[in-house]
Amino acid sequence: AIWGLPAWLGIVLVVPCGAVLGFLIERLFVRPLLGQPFLSVMMMTLMLATVLEGLRYVIRGADSFKLPFTPGGLWQLGPVSVIPGTAISFVAALVIFVLLLLLFRYTKVGLSMRVVAADHEVAQSLGIRVKRVFSISWAMSGAFAAVCGVLVGMVFTVTPVMGEVGLGNGLPVLLLGGLTSIPGAMVGGILLGVIEALG
């Protein structure tokens, strides 16, 4: 949107760019903290998020904008009116949820991630390359974060601080659903959404 690229090209490029950014963050900032308490890693990533947000202000200022490919109007599903961006985001979230479930249950990479998340030492004793799994995990996280950024941008206005809203909602979701449970996180997210809607 900022550089005037076609919408489809922007969507195609944002995913690998997110993966590369996630990979670089792991290599440069997270890997040196391997073996340190979880709180140290969390503080590092929060600090890095603040720095990246500051760079966004320097480059583009505080301007907000809408994604140019966001569908307008309303979709009628029987008696129900649905905002297109919200419907697309919901379906995409379900697809990502299913893909992650399949990844963690039926693939070697996914199973390795689960073992590493549970215990680094056990993972190493089983021959799992912990550092490699970390790199893959962060690259995947960056890619999914990029996709989520596009989906959120289809519903809300894109601003430099839009990530803070997701962070503020993400922590309660993790506490409700659990740190290692994708279905639990999904249920926690739905519960939080219902609570916000009713509140």
Task: Spell out what each predicted region is.
Residues 81-159, 182-188:
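Helix-loop-helix "hairpin" substructures at the membrane interface of multi-pass membrane proteins
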Residues 4-16, 135-145, 149-199:
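Transmembrane alpha-helical segments in multi-pass inner-membrane proteins
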Residues 3-5, 33, 37, 107, ...:
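Membrane-helix interface residues
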Residues 30-35, 73-76, 112-125, 197:
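Short amphipathic alpha-helical coupling elements at transmembrane boundaries
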Residues 18, 22, 79, 119:
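Glycine-rich phosphate-binding loops of nucleotide-dependent enzymes
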